[in-house]
């Protein structure tokens, strides 16, 4: 029985923590137009806010933040975005990485836009 309870508890906790990025994505799509620069900026800002909110308060999970993936590792490798960490901490690195992802999404969307609606 304890294994079943632990499994249910883990599933509920995981679903709760997934609400933060889900809410950020829903708000970004609700407030902005598809393929716009405003959506990329809003999504990056809301994602950063969602991660900050998830890592403070009751939940307090400051690990698995997107910006942590860019910080130096013991082997000496570091992303160019790690240079923003002294200026604004992991949150600025998270925002910079989310902005890069938004720019990439806009580029892919602009490249694929002429092909939309055409039959193969």
Predicted stretch roles:
Residues 1-120:
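Membrane-embedded alpha-helical bundles of multi-pass enzymes
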